[in-house]
Every structure is written in C-alpha cells, then in structure tokens.
C-alpha cells in the first residue's frame, strides 16, 4: 500500500502519452496571463488520470483474491471553469472530435441503410409457359380464369325498359323479298293517297301562313316519296322484261346480254315519254334542261370563287 501512495505522490515523473493536438497560436497579450493557468489545468488533468489508473489497479487486485479491505477512494478535484482562460478552453476543444464529422458519418450511415433496405421490384409469380386449364372430360364445363381485366366502360344508368323488335326486318330471319313485301302491303298506297288528299283540303282551309307552309312541305315530301317508289317500280319492271327475253335467247343457244346502268336509264325515259302527250313531254324536257343548267351554274360559281381565293 505504501508503494501505491508513493506512486501517487510521484505521478508527474511517470511517462504519459501526449495527445495529438493541433497547433494553436495565442495572442501576444494573453500569452503571459494564460500560460500559468494552462500549466495548472494540465497538472490537475494529469493528476486525475493517475488517480483513475490507480483505482483501476486496485479493482484488479481485489478481484485476484486479496483479502485486504479497500481504502476510501480519493475524490477527484473539481475544476472551476470560471478561472480558466478562453485560450485553454479552445485548446481543449480542439483535442475533442468535431460534431460535424459525427453528423456526416451518421448521414452516410443512414443513406447506406436506406439503400440496403429498399425492396427489390416484384416479379410476376406466373410464368408465360403455364399450361392452360383443361377439362377433365369432354362433358365437363371448361375452367376459365377469373383474373381478367375489367372493362373501363361502365353502364351508369341501366335501361330496364323492354326492347321491342320487329321479326319481319330482323337479319336473323333472312333476306327480305321486296316483291312479296310490296304485294303484302299494297293497301298502304291507298292510305297514303287518302292522307295526301286530306292535306290538300287542310291547306285550302287554313289561314295561318306558318301552318300552311308546314303542311305544304309535308305534302311535297309525300309526293316525292311516291315518285321515288314509282321510279323504282319502273326499273324493276324493265329488268324483269329484259331477263325474261334473255332467258328465251339463252334457251335458243345465244349468249346473254346484261344491261348497263346507262342503258337502263335510256329505256326507262323512252317508256316514260311513250305514255305522255306532246305537251307533257315538252314540259318534262324543259324541267330537265333547267335542272341541268342550274347545276352547271352552281359548279361555275364554285370554281370562280375557288380561283379568287387562290
């Protein structure tokens, strides 16, 4: 124990590893005043270090099995920071590790941990070469997957009304025979004629100009539809007669002759003018001439406007 006490008294003579310190230059004015304080702080720090080492040695001796009673530990002297100069404090702070370095190292550690913890992209568990589901037997229902994309179209307000359809004009029934349909609904022509006669009578009675103009437009539309039906019937009758003649010639061993569209129009005009008087034919030709002249005039006006714009 005497040896230990002697070592504490001669603690300044022991070798101490000097810490690596940065060079710090003091002001010439504060060098004289701070040198003594620095020496005192260094001496007290060395004494505290030696006391700590002695305490460690005592703990090791007690653990090895010595039955000696431990002596009361010497209290380390407390340093009064108010008596220390700023130069000494700055020097002591320079020896400590900087907080900026710690923060940078912590940032890099967090970034590396983030990169390590980022999950890898998911891979589809289903391979492209998966076999399609097969039926157990030909009588069993076929298995279908439920993982199908849902269509983006949505029926917001469903129409719950019953949808009616006419089976006569349904394509599922088959192709419509116009000749049979015209014969079956021939009575409609009488109804149309009656409607036209009623409209003519109303046009004569009404005094309202707007209503009269409306009824005149309706009558004109009905007459134009009637003329269109009549022209269509004439064309069909002409083709029927031509096919009948050609069949007879083919039976005699001659080659068939098919009418062109232009020939059909010529023969229709000839038949139409045959049933007219001379005055009716002249009026029909005059109307046709005016119609063609008006069409040509419109085309010329359009061409002149296009040239002026160009």
Curated annotation (Swiss-Prot):
What species does this protein belong to?
A: Fusarium vanettenii (strain ATCC MYA-4622 / CBS 123669 / FGSC 9596 / NRRL 45880 / 77-13-4) (Fusarium solani subsp. pisi)
**What protein does this entry describe?**
rRNA biogenesis protein RRP36
Where does this chain mainly localize? nucleus
Family of the protein in this entry: Belongs to the RRP36 family.
Task: Please give the InterPro entries that the UniProt record associates with this protein.
Answer: RRP36
Pfam families to which the protein is assigned, alphabetical:
RRP36
Q: Which GO terms describe its cellular component?
A: 90S preribosome; nucleolus
- How does this protein assemble? Associates with 90S and pre-40S pre-ribosomal particles.
Q: Where is the signal peptide?
A: none
Cite the record's Low complexity compositional bias ranges: 106-121
Q: Which UniProt keywords apply?
A: Coiled coil, Nucleus, Ribonucleoprotein, Ribosome biogenesis, rRNA processing
Q: What is this protein's function per UniProt?
A: Component of the 90S pre-ribosome involved in the maturation of rRNAs. Required for early cleavages of the pre-RNAs in the 40S ribosomal subunit maturation pathway.
Q: Where are the compositionally biased (Acidic residues) regions?
A: 24-43, 52-74
């Amino acid at each position: 124990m005497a040896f230990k006490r002697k070592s504490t008294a001669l603690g300044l003579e022991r070798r101490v590893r000097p810490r690596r310190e940065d060079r710090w230059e003091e002001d010439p004015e504060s060098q004289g005043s701070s040198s003594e304080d620095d020496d005192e702080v260094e001496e007290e720090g060395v004494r505290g270090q030696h006391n700590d080492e002695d305490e460690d040695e005592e703990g090791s001796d007690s653990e090895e099995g010595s039955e000696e009673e431990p002596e009361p530990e010497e209290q380390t002297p407390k340093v009064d920071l108010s008596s220390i100069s700023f130069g000494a404090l700055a020097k002591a702070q320079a020896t400590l590790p900087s907080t900026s370095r710690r923060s940078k190292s912590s940032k890099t550690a967090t970034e590396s941990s983030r990169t390590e913890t980022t999950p890898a992209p998911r891979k589809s568990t289903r391979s492209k070469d998966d076999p399609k589901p097969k039926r157990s037997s030909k009588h069993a229902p076929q298995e279908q997957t439920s993982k199908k994309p849902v269509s983006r179209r949505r029926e917001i307000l469903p129409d719950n009304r019953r949808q009616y359809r006419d089976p006569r004009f349904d394509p599922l029934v088959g192709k419509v025979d116009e000749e049979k349909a015209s014969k079956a609904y021939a009575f409609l022509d009488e109804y149309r004629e009656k409607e036209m006669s009623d409209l003519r009578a109303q046009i004569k009675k009404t005094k309202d100009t707007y209503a009269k103009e409306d009824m005149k437009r309706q009558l004109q539309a009905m007459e134009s539809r009637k003329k269109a039906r009549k022209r269509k019937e004439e064309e069909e009758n002409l083709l029927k007669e031509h096919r009948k003649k050609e069949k007879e010639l083919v039976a005699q061993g001659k080659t068939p002759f098919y009418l062109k569209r232009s020939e059909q129009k010529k023969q229709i005009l000839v038949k139409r003018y045959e049933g007219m008087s001379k005055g009716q034919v002249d009026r029909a030709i005059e109307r046709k001439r005016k119609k063609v002249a008006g069409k040509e005039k419109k085309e010329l006006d359009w061409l002149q406007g296009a040239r002026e714009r160009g």
